[in-house]
Structures are given as C-alpha cells and as structure tokens.
Amino acid sequence: MAAVQVVGSLPSGQLREAPRDAIPEGGNGFRRLSARLCALRPDDSSSARTEIHLLFDQLISENYSEGSGVAPEDVSALLVQACRLVPLNQNHLVSKVSQLIHHLLNRLQVIVDEQRLDFLLAYTISAIHQCSSWTHMEILQALAALVYCNGSKCQKYLLELLGETGLLMKLSDLAQSDPEVRRAAVHCMANLCLSVPGQPYLEEPYQNVCFQAFLTILQSPKSSDMDDITFCMLLQNALKGIQSLLNGGRMKLTQTDELGALLAVLKKFMFHGLPGLNIEMPMVLYPTPLPQYDGRTPIKPQQSESSASRPTLNKKKKSKVKPKKIQQGEEEEKESSGEIEAAPVTGTGRVNLHEGNTWCPSSLGVQSLPLDGSGAAGKDGVSSPFSSSSWKRVSSSESDFSDAEGGMQSKMRSYQAKVRQVALVCFLSTIKSIEKKVLYGYWSAFIPDTPELGSPQSVSLMTLTLKDPSPKTRACALQVLSAILEGSKQFLSVAEDTSDHRRAFTPFSVMIASSIRELHRCLLLALVAESSSQTLTQIIKCLANLVSDAPYDRLKLSLLTKVWNQIKPYIRHKDVNVRVSSLTLLGAIVSTHAPLPEVQLLLQQPCSSGLSNSNSATPHLSPPDWWKKAPAGPSLEETSVSSPKGSSEPCWLIRLCISIVVLPKEDSCSGSDAGSAAGSTYEPSPMRLEALQVLTLLARGYFSMTQAYLMELGEVICKCMGEADPSIQLHGAKLLEELGTGLIQQYKPDSTAAPDQRAPVFLVVMFWTMMLNGPLPRALQNSEHPTLQAGACDALSSILPEAFSNLPKDRQILCITVLLGLNDSKNRLVKAATSRALGVYVLFPCLRQDVIFVADTANAILMSLEDKSLNVRANAAWSLGNLTDTLIVNMETPDPSFQEEFSGLLLLKMLRSAIEASKDKDKVKSNAVRALGNLLHFLQPSHIEKPTFAEIIEESIQALISTVLTEAAMKVRWNACYAMGNVFKNPALPLGTAPWTSQAYNALTSVVTSCKNFKVRIRSAAALSVPGKREQYGSVDQYAGIWNALVTALQKSEDTRDFLEFKYCASLRTQICQALIHLLNLASASDLPCIKETLELNGNMVQSYILQFIKSGAEGDDTGAPHSPQERDQMVRMALKHMGSIQAPTGDTARRAVMGFLEEILAVCFDSSGSQGALPGLTNQ
C-alpha cells in the first residue's frame, strides 16, 4: 500500500528555481535530484524501486555545505514527495526514506512547516505500526528529527505517541527488547519536550508523562543486553528531555519526592564513569543531611587524596604512560572540551551520535597543549598537581589494552564525560526552576563541609572540579556551583566559627562555616591545578560569588588572605577573560562586608614584595612591573605587627587599577585580547571597565585609603570621560559619584573620621574645579547617550556642600543651570537623575535661602511629579520632601524674609501636587505625605486666614488621615504619622477645634493600638505627644480616648506574631510612657476621673512600665524622647507638680489618686537608687 493512501493526498508543492549562477554546488545537486524525484509517480515495479533507492542514496551522499542555498520549504516538499513514492510494505525503502528524512533535516537544520509535518508524522507513525521491527530504529530517528522544536504542532498525535498505550511509551519501556530502539524512542520524547520561545509548550499532562518516563529510565539499572555507549546515549536523551521540560521555568517541581528523586539521579550521573567512584544513591534525596544519602564503594584514603592533597604519589605512574596513550587522552580532551554556554539542548535532534563528534577544537578556543617532560599529559596537557588523569590508574598495567581497545576506551570515556556534562546542565536548569530556600535544603548533598577522604558523604561538586579529566565537565560543575552560590548571602549569613566549637553536637552555623572553609580550600586547589583558560575563568567567577556572599565578619581570619594572595598572579595571565575575572574577584573582596580589618591590612601590604609565596608555578605570567609583582606579602599576624597605623605605603591595588585604565598595554599579555579594538594601545575595554569598577568599590568601602589618591583619580576620571567609548565615560562618572559620596560621608556629623583625617575643603574644591573645567559638562549635555547623562547628573549631585559654596561663581551657576535645563529632558533616565540632583542641591546651606533658586527648583519638581514614568515621579517626590525640609529650616531662622517672599501661589500648587502624589504608588506616596506634613507645618497665619487655603488644608489633612489608616507599606504609614506630628507643630492651625481634629486623633490611636509594624506604632505615639496645649487635644472625651488608647497600646506592646518586631518593644514602651506623662502634664480637672478609672484597672502595669522608662535611659529610639534617667525622672516630677496646681472641686478624689500614683513611682525610684546615691531632685522628698 502506498504511503499516499495512509494520510491522503498532499501536493508536494512547486520547487523554487534560483538563478543558476547564484546556486552553490550543493544547491545545484539538490535541485537536480529533487526535480528527478518529483517527476516520478508511485510505481511498485522493481526498476522503479531501484531508481528511487539510487536517488535516495545520491540525496544522502550529496555534499550540503553551510549556506548551500537550499530553502527549507524545498526540503519539506521533497520529503513529502519521497514518502508518497514509498509504500509501507517496502521495508527497505521505508528504512531508506527514514534515513533521508533524518539526514536532510539534521544536515540542513530544517524545521518542517505545520502542513507538511502533519503528513510526514502520519507517515512515520504508520510506518512503525506496519513495518518490520528492524526498520524501527531508522523510522524513530526520522520521527525525532521531525518533532524537533515542533512539539506544539504535534497536538493531533500526542495521544497516539504519549498516551498510556502510546507508541513512544511502549518503545521506551524497560520491557523493550531492542536497546537501540528504546534509546531512539527516548530521543523522540526528548525532542517533543523541546520548544521554541514564543510558541506554546507541551501540555501539562504530557509534560508529567514524559518527566516520569525519563525519571524511570534514569532510576533503572543498565540492562544486560545494552552496551555501555548506547546506555550513555540513553541517559543523555533522558537528561536532555528533563532539561527541556524545566527550561524557562515551565515545569514546576512542587512535590518534595519528585524533586528529591530528580536530584538523586542527577547526583548519580554527575559522577557517571568518573574513575575510582562507584556511587550508589537512594531513590530519593530528602532535604536533611542524613548519612544514607550518598554511599559509594569505599576507596582507600590515600587513593582519594592522591590527586588533591598528595600530588607526589602519582609521579611514578605518570612516567610509565606511553606517548601514544597520551595522544589518545589528548584527543578525548579535545573532543569533550568547549564552552558550557553553548546550549546543549538545541542539538538534540541534529547530531547522529553513532557517527561521533566532528567538533574542531581550534574553533572552540582550546589551546594546543604541550606534553610535559615525562611524556605525561595533564587535564589539558600541562603538568599540574592533578595532571595524571584518574582513568589512567584504572588498570594495573598500561599495556593491558591493544590500540583498538585503547581507542574504544577513549570513546567510552568521551561518552561518559558527556553524560556527566548533560547531568550538570540539567541540574543547572533544576536550580533555576526551584526557589533558593528549597534548594538550600539539599546543600549538604552537593557542597562539602569536610575534606574529601573517602567518607560516604564526601563526593560533591568539588570532586568533579578537582578530579574530572574533562575541562568541559569541570567548567559545568563550576557553573552549577556558581548558580547555587548566587544569592546565597542570607543562607550563608548564619555561619559562624569565630569561637572554638566544643559542644556535643555540631550547630548548623558551624556546619555552614565548615562548608565555606572547604569551598575556599577546594576552589584554591582547583585554581592551582587548572590550565584550561575557560575553566580557570569559571573557578575565579565561582570564588567571586563565594566571596560576595560569605559572612567573613563571622568567620576566622585568613580565608580572604589566602584568596587574595593566590589570585594576584592571574591579573597578568595571557587570557583576557582570566584577567577580567581576577579583577572581578578582587572587587568582590574589597566590597564584601567593607571595611574589613583583614582586607585593610591586605591593601596596605608593601608593593615591593615579590611572587615568592604566590604560586610562582602558575603558567602564563609576564614579567611584572614594580606595582604588578602581586605580593603574597607577610601573614596577617605579621602585617598587623610590622605595619604601623597610618602607614603611608601606597595601595598596590589602586596603583594597579589606575595603570590598567590609563597606561598602554604590554605586548606580553595581549595574545588573546578579543575585547580590545584593532589598533588600540590600551588594555581591552572589559579589563579597563573592571579596573574602574574596582576603584569605585574601593572608594565605597575603603575611602580613607582611596582619598590619598584623590587628585590622581580625578585625572583618571577626566581621561575616561574624555574618551569616545560611552561605557568608559559612564564608569568614570560612577567613580566620580562614589568619590563625591565618600567626601560627603566624611563631613557628616555622625562620621567616624576625625577632623584631621578628612580631605581638606580646599582640596575638594580643587578636585571639583578640575571636574567642572574638564569633560563633565560635555557629558552632561551629551543627549546621544542618555545613560551617560544620567550618570553625570548623579555625579554632579555628589558635590560636598561645603565645597560647592567655595567653587567659583561661574561653576556654581553652571551646575544649577545645567540641572534645571536637563529637567526638561525627554529621556526618563535623565529626568529622574536630574529630579534627584535638584533635591540634593535644595538642601545646600548656600542655596536654601535663595528664594528664586528654591522657587525654580519647586516648579521643576512639580513638573516632574506629573511625568508618566514612576521612577521620575518617585525621585521628584523625594526632592519635594527635601525642598519642604528646606522650608522648615528657613522658617526656624531669625530672619523672616524668606517666608514673606516665598510665593503663596506656589505653596498652593505644591500642596495640590502633594495631595495628588499621595494617591500614587507607594514609592511616590511615602515622600508625598512627608512633603504634606512639612507644608502644613510651614503655613503662616497670613496663609491660613485666606479662604483659598481653607479647602486645600482640609484636603491635605484628609489625605494624611487616609494614608495613616491605609494598608500601605510600612515606610508610607511611618511617614504619614511623622507628617501628622509635623502638622500638630503648627500653632496657627485650629487643632482641637477644627472638625478634622477627632479624625486625626482617631487615626493615630487606631495605629498605636493595632498596627502590625511596631515602628509605625512608635511614630504614631510620638505624634500623639506633639501638641503642647491641653485645648489642642479637644474635648474631654477626645482626651480620654487618646489616654485609654495609649494605655491599651502599652498593654499590647508585646503582642506580635512577627519575631522581628520584638526588638522594637522597648522603644515602643518608651514612646508610649513619654506620651502618657506628657498627657498628665497637660491634664485639666475634668480629665482626672478618666485617668483615675484607668489607673484603678491597670495602675500596676502602667507603673511598672513607667519605672522601666525612668531607669532604662536611652532605648535607641529616634523620636526625641529624653534619654537620661535624670531627665525622665524630671518629667514625672513636672507632671506631679502640674497635678498639684489643678484646682479640683471639693471632695474630688481623682486628683489625689493620680498624685498618689506619681508619688509612688518617685518613691520606688528613690528606694532603688538609694544604694548608689539619690537621683537629683529626690533628696527633698
């Protein structure tokens, strides 16, 4: 029966003709042969079959070079015609047409269109059902090529292929007698799971079916009738299938057993075929470090150690290796080396694994590698402590294999290495598809916490990094480790080993600290041993991830010193990627928990030290200059003794980075500088950018050291910002911003820098004059590069206020004019940066009393508050908050001219804009309410009396009340309560008599008693204690409501479900006690019955907390509460004095009860302090 009868007729389509002279030779051959094929009609004669057979052979043997000019639709049309010509009862022809489908689709990288795919799928599925079993292998290969990246277009056939009794389910089953057919069926399933971005994915039920099928295959032992290479290919296909399901986060592993089962097989096959290891894994890994997780055949500790701790043990064995054997090992390395970044899935249906790989090592950047003197090759042919590959120790005699057997062994090792690589890449996809907190439950299964000495749990990712003979597998393992470490700061922060551990059990914190130590040890061992540049780059990136997240302030000293000393030589490595990643690592060291005393000492190491202790055996080092000698330096202990504090020894790292940025490159290390432009005299751009980044991090973390180079760094910045490359310009601007920020920090009131250690103002003025006379203004006006403009704006906002006032007048005017002009920019990045910069300038003492500048800035900010970009509005709201802070500062100066001259109309506009902004997103809202509070505080009686202001004041206060009560972010509600306190400070507002008074107080009392966040409660209690007069609290009922709410809040000051809030309990009680005493100080005779009633019910509780308040002193709160016990005691005395002055009606007991309560508190204070001398003021009691 002809194939055409299986699926009905489908036109093969017209083949496109291309101009003859434009068609390459391969395209010509294809068109000639396809024209002959299209001319044929279905015919069962033997001559017709012979002709078709010959045509198929010719099409298969045709040389299809890249860019052969063959159109995908022509290939699809030809395959449809071929299938129409071959009836399903002709097994040999069906086999041949299947080979043709597989060959053409793979060779020409064609994905079949949906219409022809339908026909070809129906044909191949029918062929499997009807043809002899010996054809199934070729038909399945054709099916795999057809469904490749076409899973979403195969919906019609999914039930037939993947249903309970589906074709692929049966052929991939363990019961399938032919191992090759089983492997090919799994290959088809893996290709079905592969999807193209933007297209629909495989439906969830079928995803689960495939996942379970792949998992079953991986959990099943190798059957006796399957050879090792077929088994490796089967494993690869199953692993690639799972990877395709996980990629892009499409399939979620939500069940613990499901994830644990997958991790168990991944761990098993990460080590597949690694010599000397025979891993027996449980079916499921559970997220607890139990000893049964990882059993393996015991190995003598000496053997396990030999390739890591004791490299000398292998010397004899290395000398026995024959040159011929080494070449085979080298060939195997070339075959399995390459970049992990090359997506391993995309070739699933494009490589016939039977035919071996045809990768060209040179095209992958693998260096040709020499042999060492003894004739032994290392991982890449370079002698190292790990150079004797473990598989060479499998046999007791090197001559046990014939050449043919040796070739087979080499091929076997190559396939096993690929299984390990695919397992690692699949693990990478798994990591990306699960939450980090879930992943860290399995930390101990993959990360070592003790040196590897053959114990059951000692195999880990570091085993592969140190012992795998394939550089690509080592790179894969490192990339997985990097993914695990990335974002692990919170998890690792629990680590601690600063004190000696002498407990009966090992705390979790000590176990994590041990893991961190072991990771350092193993990665530094790997660094010494590695000679492949690509893998070396991965090791250094991995170290950078580890250094960024490890809590060195909680770990014993010397870990960073070892990393520091060992990485220095690699800064002069001949491969630019290694050099760049080495600088990245140094940047990570100077940014982690900065400033660290250990790093401070490392930065102060003398520049004259040599390389004697710093891995002088490391290859590819060029002769270093005086600052490039990468000193190992003395130990940390020696340094602390020999380097006096304040040593003027230059910082070698700053010198190095400056030289990389500004000095011409050396020829000796430019061999593989792919990043440098042709003819460039400088280091490659990535190297210079990384050096600028390190300088920026040094300025951020170790400014006291960096400031010694202030003017020199200024010249570096000017040079960078004057270059043509916008990236170099931008990084120069970032460095300028960081230096400016460092100078500002030195002059802040809370700075730890002594006045004589600060950079003098005249020097800062010189520095900024150099900047403003250099290329900075040009960068600010470079509208072609808005990112650079925004960076330059940020830099300009980091001028020290004291220096700005001393700049030449024309430079001051330049800064202000440029910023006000850029606020009109159409680019949102520039506009956001400008809005923020104006918010900084408006706080400068020399500008804040300039009414014209403040008004111009206000108008610019109000315009930005209406921008479509949230980021622009957020920055504008922050600046509006700063501007209103300036209004308050000016209000408190003796000179009233600013208030008088500031436009009332502009105040109205600011109030309206702030009200609108308070309805915006939280990022805008938090500063909008801050601004509202300041503006209402600033309003003068002359404003409030005007009818135009009455309505806007009411609206503003309603906006604040609604924000206090809303379920917004903590910062928003905190700022709203703070703003309400500012409103209460304005004596001109009718607080106490206005209708909004009760609403405002009710909002604050609601928050103080019930808000989940204690910082917001503290701020609302502070606001309630702001009014200075009794009448501002309104009626007796209003006063009683506030008093009762504060007592209730005190009672509930420990009621929280959030453990993090407990640290604010003491501050909350302090603020509530202060508010209660403040209310007592203002109470009138009519308020006393309510106070007495509350004290009768809760007097003991209130008394105990007020006693704590008096005795405790400062609680670290930020609300302005009196901080010394003497001051607090005085508050209670004043309240008692006030009570005594109240004229109560005859027979009134309330005043006496309240006075008794206060006297009792003071008496207890006197008694408790008697042994140490009475507190001031109690001696007359």
Swiss-Prot record:
What is this protein called in UniProt? HEAT repeat-containing protein 6
The HEAT repeat boundaries are 159-198, 452-490, 514-552, 558-595
Residues recorded with modification Phosphoserine:
336-337, 399, 402, 643
Record field: compositional bias (Low complexity): 383-399
> Region Disordered: which residues?
294-347, 371-407, 613-648
Keywords assigned:
Phosphoprotein, Repeat
Taxonomic source organism: Pongo abelii (Sumatran orangutan)
Bias kind Basic residues: ranges: 313-325
